[in-house]
Every structure is written in C-alpha cells, then in structure tokens.
C-alpha cells in the first residue's frame, strides 16, 4: 500500500516538473539564443495556424513590449475578447514580425505577419496577419 502511494506521489511530482520545464522563460536565455528561439516559435506557429503567411523576406524583426500597468478597476474593464484579457500588468511579451517585400507583394498592415509571444512561458498568444486579420491563440 505504501509503495503504491509512493509511486503515485512520485508520478505527480515528475508530472509537475515536466510541465514546469516545458514552459521555458525567455528571460534567462542569452540574447542570440532568445532571438533564435523566438523566431523558431513564430515560424512553427505560422506554419500551423496560417501557413500561407510564412513568407520570409529577410530576417524577422523582434521587438520587446510590456503590458501597460492597469489599476484593479481598469483590469476589470478589459473585455474578454481582447488579446490581452487575463494578462498581468507589466507582463513582458515579444513581437516577431515577418517583413514584406513590396516589390513582390504588398499587405495592408505593412508586414506579412506578426506573432506575439509571452516572455515568461514562451507561448504564442496572438497572430496579426498582413491583411489586418488578428487571430487569438488562447
């Protein structure tokens, strides 16, 4: 009986460790490793969700952003359909932008696609396409 309980506890512990390690924080990575990881995640996301927008016209542009600080009252007013619904004030995210080549094709938004990725979990949470369509990945 004790061994069965011990095995179950060990399994649960390993499950928590595996889940935690899969959500890698980009904060601790060196600059070049972080950028290559962001580009890889963005390409995988586009390949899965919008493969026709995985057009590489030069190197992707990476920019770092922070969710603005909100008062508790302002947080309650964020609509559920918002891309940033549930985000914490000050939470850091990256935008990986795939630039357009206007000599080949021109998009309304001025880029082919943008993938939004959280810094703390390395998870993509939104895609903005060059035709002005936004896809939430929640």
Predicted feature residues:
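Bacterial Sec-dependent N-terminal signal peptides
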Residues: 1-26
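Short, non-transmembrane alpha-helical segments in secretory-pathway proteins
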Residues: 25-82
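Exposed beta-strand-loop-beta-strand "reactive/processing" segments of non-cytosolic proteins
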Residues: 63-119
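A short, surface-exposed interaction/processing loop segment used at functional sites
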Residues: 107-138
């Amino acid at each position: 009986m004790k061994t069965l309980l011990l095995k179950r506890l060990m399994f649960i512990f390993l499950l928590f460790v595996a889940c935690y390690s899969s959500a890698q924080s980009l904060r601790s990575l060196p600059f070049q490793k972080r950028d290559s990881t962001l580009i890889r995640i963005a390409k995988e996301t586009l390949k899965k969700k919008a493969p026709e927008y995985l057009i590489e016209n030069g190197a992707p542009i990476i920019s770092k952003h922070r969710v603005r600080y909100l008062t508790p009252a302002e947080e309650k007013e964020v609509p559920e359909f918002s891309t940033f619904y549930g985000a914490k004030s000050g939470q850091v995210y990256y935008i990986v932008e795939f630039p357009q080549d206007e000599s080949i094709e021109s998009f309304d938004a001025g880029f082919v696609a943008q993938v939004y990725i959280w810094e703390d979990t390395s998870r993509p949470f939104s895609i903005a396409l060059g035709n002005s369509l936004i896809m939430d990945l929640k």
